[in-house]
Amino acid sequence: MALGLSQVASQAASQTLDTAMAGSLTRAAGAQAQKIALDTENSILDGQMDSASKSLNSGQKAAKAIQF
């Protein structure tokens, strides 16, 4: 059974939209993955800075406690 012109056009439009949506989802997933990686790296760096600050503060408190 032959398809009418409107059915052919509808199928073509659906395929165009499907392709666009697939590309959009792929790009969004890639961007989200990059954000997760960056957030993780920032969290690690914040933790390292916090640990360094605590270490410095601890050293300063110890130095004050040793004063004669």
Swiss-Prot record:
User: Coiled-coil segments, which residues?
Assistant: none
GO CC annotation, single: pilus
Recorded superkingdom = Bacteria
Q: Does the keyword Secreted apply?
A: yes
The subcellular localization recorded is: Secreted; Fimbrium
Which terms are listed as keywords in the entry? Fimbrium, Secreted, Virulence
Secreted as a keyword of this entry, yes or no, is: yes
What's its job? Major structure protein of the hrp pilus, which is a component of the type III secretion system (T3SS, Hrp secretion system) required for effector protein delivery, parasitism, and pathogenicity. The hrp pilus functions as a conduit for protein delivery into the host cell.
Give the family, as the similarity comment puts it: Belongs to the HrpA type 2 family.
| The protein, known as | Hrp pili protein HrpA
**Organism of this sequence:** Pectobacterium atrosepticum (strain SCRI 1043 / ATCC BAA-672)
Q: Which gene encodes it?
A: hrpA
